[in-house]
């Protein structure tokens, strides 16, 4: 993943819009996110454990006074132009619908924006399950409100970004991605109860190990995937559990002990497996956080592996690419934990690998993956960073 520098971003902004004077121009950054454990639990009111990445989306912005928005991106060829008076979803605007949706949601809150000229640059791969959509949404929301002198707290902005994806884009995302992008902290993972929004910043002390993200290079189109189908299956499971316990509001309330008692009411085997994953994954998150706090990194790694197996066997969201990576990485040199991360159906895995074995790990996994799948994966040795902020820039 490339490193961005403020001077380069300002130059690109000036060239993209033929601007001679860079006055009143500001730069903001929102990270991508990687979820260490706790997958497909966020929309079920369960626990998640994500962290903000040091890679993400940069936004260079200059306010206008004509109610127009002129958008360009280093990552896409198309430019997007629209007005405050026309904030409708438009398929031809493609990626531009994400910032447009944010502006539309802010307008619903009564926020009167003057228009803006905006340039984006992202260094997280799109469709890889590292929350490029939450990243561009949060950087747009945070940057626009900061430039306009409007004080909206980060939790409210995260909820606004979730509404944008749900209502404007049409993807039923949970709140985890936006929350992690907004509330991330360097070298910490975010233990979040997605029902109450109570959270704890837990230090990620890797003691000679590194986080390695492996991109399967199979793009994962979230809106076109079976994400919404899984969400509906969980809703069906919850409805059936309520036959025995009527006061359940979400699956995140169901402990393993409760499921042992209530589970048999679910007669459909597929629905039963979907619910079982959510219940056991919540338990794994709690155990993983406890293991990290106790310095038990090996235990944390084993829980990561168990998470992937549940996502494969009970939730059916892995696929041949992610399963191939998992099988190779679980036995690769220096790897003590690995799992798919994100919604699945392609995208990435996250692994904990000893820093002295990273090259050997990558070699073994790359060769095995290419032999079976036909093309190579891409590796990113990464760390956890801060949430959305005004960016002061590199060199």
Swiss-Prot record:
InterPro entries: Galactokinase, Galactokinase_bac, Galactokinase_CS, GalKase_N, GHMP_kinase_C_dom, GHMP_kinase_C_sf, GHMP_kinase_N_dom, GHMP_knse_ATP-bd_CS. The record marks 33 as: Transition state stabilizer. Keywords: ATP-binding, Carbohydrate metabolism, Cytoplasm, Galactose metabolism, Kinase, Magnesium, Metal-binding, Nucleotide-binding, Transferase. Gene3D superfamilies: 3.30.230.10, GHMP kinase, C-terminal domain. It holds the Pfam family GHMP_kinases_C. One of its GO terms (biological process) is galactose metabolic process. Mg(2+) binds at residues 133, 165. Transmembrane segments: none annotated. Belongs to the GHMP kinase family. GalK subfamily. Catalyzes the transfer of the gamma-phosphate of ATP to D-galactose to form alpha-D-galactose-1-phosphate (Gal-1-P). ATP binds at residues 73, 127-133. Substrate binds at residues 39-42, 227. It catalyses: alpha-D-galactose + ATP = alpha-D-galactose 1-phosphate + ADP + H(+). HAMAP family: Galactokinase (MF_00246). The keyword Nucleus does not apply. The active site is at 177 (proton acceptor). Its EC number is 2.7.1.6. It comes from Halalkalibacterium halodurans (strain ATCC BAA-125 / DSM 18197 / FERM 7344 / JCM 9153 / C-125). One of its GO terms (molecular function) is galactokinase activity. The keyword Cytoplasm applies. Pathway: Carbohydrate metabolism; galactose metabolism. It is an enzyme of class 2 (transferase). GO terms for cellular component: cytosol. This is Galactokinase.
